[in-house]
């Protein structure tokens, strides 16, 4: 039976075909010397057979403040070489420097201008108070552009162009002191959309972590919030850092950090604006649990025939380590992979049959502590 158009979320799901019982990149890896707290988030792209990883390195104290954005490459997904530091934060902890902490490097190729763009988050940082979470606040999304044209310019160097999204008079009511905590652009026809996130970190405990959409006619912007659609109803409590992949039938899948234990979340869309209720994909089972907490996916890499590599970050499991009063685990962050397949049900089951307990809006799963965030 031929597929004549995009399938609904009820007709497809991700299946893990192979798990790995250890991380592919950790503080023990060659090239990670001096990285105190490990790795978190970012994006992986595959270019001419080479995997390029742009990730956040939590190199020193203050935790989640003194950061490097780094570029790594691999030929086989398992063995990695550090190419260099793309950006480094100041580590200022007074609340005055708007680039005190840098997070979430997202490389995106602009075919129209034939250049790689790098989007990343810059935060102010200060000690928390009993009422506010200030470790990362007033996030602003920066756009940088490779100075080298063409696909081979992915390694940069990158020139900062300016801020494309931040909290201000045009913010939606659900956005808060955290500012803009993530940004991922993807193209739909002649228009660009971007997932972006925020939370009201001005009041503890933090009740919701949400995402919305922004739109632009060019990757460089200007970007405008899709206020009538926001916040998106993919998750009811917690969603961060969605990364979008276009599927072969023209539809879209987003993978993201969710509150479910040992899992990441994912959602489908036929048009890039209307997204299905979240489903969960367990990436750690049985003896393959190396992380005490699965955190942020770094995207899906299309390996052909509806198979993908899913990269994700997690806090390594270390005996005797526990979360602090804010739900933060200080064990080093590492990066892992699973092989996945997109299962397409052409007969079309009902929504409840297809999603079932995989709907991450269902009750249960890990609780979302006051500061259980994934920058």
Language-model-derived ranges and their functions:
Residues 2-100, 109-181, 186-240, 246-292, ...:
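Beta-rich carbohydrate-recognition and catalytic domains
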Residues 296-299:
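Short glycine-rich, acidic/polar surface loops and turns
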């Amino acid at each position: 039976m031929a597929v004549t158009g995009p399938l609904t979320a009820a007709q497809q799901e991700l299946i893990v075909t192979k798990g790995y019982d250890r991380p592919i990149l950790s503080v023990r890896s060659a090239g990670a010397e001096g990285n105190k707290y490990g790795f978190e988030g970012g994006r992986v792209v595959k270019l001419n057979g080479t995997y390029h990883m742009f990730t956040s390195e939590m190199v020193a104290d203050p935790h989640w403040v003194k950061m490097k954005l780094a570029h790594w490459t691999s030929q086989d997904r398992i063995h990695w070489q550090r190419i260099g530091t793309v950006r480094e934060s100041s580590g200022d902890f007074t609340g005055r420097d708007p680039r005190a902490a840098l997070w979430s490097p997202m490389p995106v190729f602009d075919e129209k201008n034939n250049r790689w763009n790098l989007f990343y988050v810059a935060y102010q940082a200060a000690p928390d108070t009993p009422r506010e979470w200030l470790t990362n606040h007033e996030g602003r999304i920066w756009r940088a552009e490779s100075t080298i044209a063409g696909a081979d310019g992915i390694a940069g160097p990158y020139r900062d162009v300016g801020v494309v999204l931040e909290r201000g008079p045009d913010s939606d009511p659900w956005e808060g002191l955290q500012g803009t905590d993530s940004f991922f652009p993807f193209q739909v026809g002649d228009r660009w959309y971007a997932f972006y996130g925020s939370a009201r970190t001005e009041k503890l405990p933090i009740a919701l972590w949400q995402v919305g959409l922004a739109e632009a006619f060019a990757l460089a912007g200007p970007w405008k919030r899709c206020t009538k659609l926001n916040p998106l109803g993919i998750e009811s409590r917690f969603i961060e850092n969605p990364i979008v992949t276009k599927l072969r039938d023209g539809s879209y899948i987003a993978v993201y950090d969710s509150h479910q234990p040992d899992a990441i979340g994912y959602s489908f869309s036929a048009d890039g604006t209307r997204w299905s209720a979240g489903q969960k994909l367990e990436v750690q089972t049985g003896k393959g649990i190396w992380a005490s907490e699965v955190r942020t996916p770094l995207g899906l890499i299309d390996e052909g025939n509806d198979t993908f590599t899913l990269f994700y970050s997690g806090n390594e499991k270390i005996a005797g380590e526990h979360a602090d009063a804010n739900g933060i685990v200080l064990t080093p962050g590492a990066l892992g992979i699973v092989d996945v397949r997109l299962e397409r049900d052409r007969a079309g089951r009902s929504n409840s049959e297809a999603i079932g307990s995989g709907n991450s809006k269902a009750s249960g799963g890990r609780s979302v502590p006051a500061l259980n965030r994934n920058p």
